[in-house]
């Protein structure tokens, strides 16, 4: 300990350099961890707010929110999900995630879905404003929670409107259940069906792993070199 304290006081610059390097690497890891979590929420916050226990896709072997289409079943809630372009009342276009549920369903913000849409605040539309999606008009009846799906703000709409927009007879993209059902997958596993979610999260976590390894190598290399330089002092002790 005496040698270590002496080295710190006599080689402040060297010690400060390695301490600063470790601090910067730590900061980078923290920032990247926050970025990974933030991007994940931008993909999944709407689904997490619904908080189903099971998600049923058209094909259990092909988990995809893009291609799945399902019919309504007793005890299960159909959820439609699509990425669309929305035109606001002032003519401005905005990318939006259209999520549909049956009328009367309670949304994460506490609103009850009716014939009117419920918009995320980040869409910057007002209550009573009429918006257009794929040539179909709908009035925004309320502003809900600021949720996102696949990196787009959410516009909650009734199932009938989603079917018109998508030109489909299907009742939704997936079925949601508050209990385990045959053919369903847990909510966390369903995230792999989001476009680019798995690759995005995998890449960021791989970078985090490399940063941890680099930080460990830098610290070990520094301590090894420093110890070897003081071998004689340690031998005397």
Describe each region flagged by the PLM.
Residues 45-86, 95-97:
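Membrane-proximal extracellular/periplasmic loop immediately following the first transmembrane helix
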């Amino acid at each position: 300990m005496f040698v270590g304290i002496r080295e710190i006081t006599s080689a402040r610059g060297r010690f400060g350099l390695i301490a600063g390097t470790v601090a910067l690497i730590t900061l980078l890891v923290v920032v990247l961890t926050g970025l990974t979590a933030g991007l994940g929420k931008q993909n999944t916050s709407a689904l997490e707010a619904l908080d189903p226990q099971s998600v049923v896709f058209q094909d259990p072997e092909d988990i995809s929110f893009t291609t799945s289409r399902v019919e309504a079943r007793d005890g299960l809630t159909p959820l439609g999900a699509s990425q669309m372009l929305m035109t606001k009342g002032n003519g401005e276009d905005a990318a939006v995630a259209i999520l549909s549920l049956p009328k009367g369903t309670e949304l994460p913000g506490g609103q009850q879905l009716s014939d009117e849409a419920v918009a995320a605040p980040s869409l910057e539309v007002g209550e009573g404003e009429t918006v257009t999606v794929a040539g179909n008009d709908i009035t925004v009846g309320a502003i809900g929670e600021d949720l996102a799906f696949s990196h787009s703000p959410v516009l909650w709409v009734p199932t009938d409107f989603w079917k018109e927009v998508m030109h489909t007879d299907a009742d939704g993209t997936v079925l949601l259940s508050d209990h385990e059902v045959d053919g369903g997958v847990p909510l966390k596993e369903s995230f792999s069906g989001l476009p680019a979610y798995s690759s995005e999260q995998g890449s960021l976590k791989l970078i985090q792993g490399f940063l941890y390894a680099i930080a460990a190598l830098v610290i070990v290399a520094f301590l090894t070199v420093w110890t070897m330089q003081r071998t004689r002092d340690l031998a005397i002790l």
